[in-house]
């Protein structure tokens, strides 16, 4: 077992009850453009078109041939675009149950599939986009071959669901998905899980155990310790629920768009796990469930999720949780001189440090304005990777991409720097800064 000792488990209230319930009926779903880094769509539909589940919505001009499909049948009600016509979302009003059909195989035939059969079927159904590369966290080229593939069957994010609870609802789907994915690489297929977790076993996969504090469950952490990446050595990652969807696709011939999502946070009345659709409207999913006041809906983790509002108020493609926090617009007078029994800090500056096990009603407040980056050692306390955290973050801030590559930025995704953003006394958001640098590296080298 690989034990992660440097990191942080956030003591936040609103932890969801670990039992799965049916969610409310969803009337609209969406494919969010921002979920796919650098993607430039060629649209195949327009507002008013009727679509089936699994029908093509658009392809990517940059990664030629990669298809993005509808998660549900219905009518395209909106194609939302932002600045410079960047695609924000394609919204579908759900109606009917029509679905496209794809190649279908018996479970015994999955082990004999050719690689091209797997690639074609995944791409036809839109599940090729469920795979993400590292570096760059994008959908891979259709002819790319990874050094390794990672499936994370654990989640240490605050307020997350227990993946084994979800996987063991349909264990054979998970195993079938692993068999299919094993055809895409000549290297290892890693399944990473928590200590003592009951994960369905398959001979095609290598199982690794991780323990300790967050980010022990991040796929970037797993790659760093098991198969580090570089520009010449690419690895892929696939979410555990997408592995199950892949298994179902190949045995049923139909796109599976069900997703189990954790609803949690201090402002959630009834934190729990619900069964819903990929891309579900978060307003409909949380209707009647929010506490009074001004709230912020987050698709994903409180550390690395996306503010979901307006045309993007839908469940993200790679998200398994929805978090709700109160908007922290208040500015307490001289909060830095109070004992702080009701406040949390990663540094031992409040008396709450002595109150082990206490949980807090976090808000969106940053507790201060932006200022210069100060190296206090807090970054190193939450960075478990073998990386010089302060030096890397400085390189990213000034845009020194050559030094950032030497210091290991190619191994990272936004979620890997989320804890650095949380503990930063300068209030920097390192995720977007990292993405800007990765985009430059991809373009310029």
From Swiss-Prot:
HAMAP family: NqrA
Enzyme class of the recorded protein, top EC level: translocase
Protein name as it appears in the record: Na(+)-translocating NADH-quinone reductase subunit A
Higher taxonomy: Bacteria, Pseudomonadati, Pseudomonadota, Gammaproteobacteria, Cellvibrionales
Quaternary organization: Composed of six subunits; NqrA, NqrB, NqrC, NqrD, NqrE and NqrF.
Functional summary from the UniProt entry: NQR complex catalyzes the reduction of ubiquinone-1 to ubiquinol by two successive reactions, coupled with the transport of Na(+) ions from the cytoplasm to the periplasm. NqrA to NqrE are probably involved in the second step, the conversion of ubisemiquinone to ubiquinol.
Catalytic activity: a ubiquinone + n Na(+)(in) + NADH + H(+) = a ubiquinol + n Na(+)(out) + NAD(+)
GO BP, one annotated term: sodium ion transport
Residue ranges of the TM segments: none
Keywords of the record: Ion transport, NAD, Sodium, Sodium transport, Translocase, Transport, Ubiquinone
Keyword Secreted in annotation: no
Family that this chain belongs to: Belongs to the NqrA family.
Enzyme Commission no: 7.2.1.1
Pfam family, one: NQRA_2nd
Statement: the UniProt record of this protein carries the keyword Transport: yes
GO molecular function list: oxidoreductase activity, acting on NAD(P)H, quinone or similar compound as acceptor
